[in-house]
Amino acid sequence: MSLPWRIRVGDAADLDAVAPLWTAVHHQHMQVMPELAPYVSDDETWRMRRALYEALLAKPDTLLLLALLDDRAVGYGLAHILDRDETWVADTWVTGPRIGEIESLSVVPELRGSGIGSQMLDRLEAHLHEQGVGDLILGALPDNTDAVRLYERRGFRPTWLYLSRFSDRRDDL
């Protein structure tokens, strides 16, 4: 059976197509955790995210995937490899010398639940395993229950919880 979308490997030249997909993630963050407002602007979040992606894509083990539907980018995923000592994991758990991080995964809202995210995760995980990496980490907002459920179905478990207190936020948390 042919899927209505296709997934291809991307590079830094594809970052303009990623911008609205990252902005959708940013909006999802605002929606699921409005109590953390104010959030940075769409332009500012993309400026910072783009700089991160450019730096990661300059490394040879980073993989960017784009999901396309009729040549329109409808999702992306990005994974890279960290030395164990660059992570918060090394001083607590026994791991291999390198740890794979699923840095980002995004699917446009109208196609969430279609299998695109799972297919991209399959490919990102396979890439990391091909690089000899067996230990994986990723992050998600705790109130993004759909994402957390997807990751837990795939064997990811909560390992670390950051608690934040930002100044000048509502005090009715």
Predicted regions and their residues:
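A short helix-loop-beta-strand connector motif used in the catalytic cores of GNAT acetyltransferases and
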Residues: 47-65, 84, 101
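Conserved acyl-donor/pantetheine-binding loop and adjacent beta-alpha core of acyl/acetyltransferases
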Residues: 78-101
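Conserved N-terminal entry element of GNAT/NAT acetyltransferase domains
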Residues: 1-20, 24, 28, 35, ...
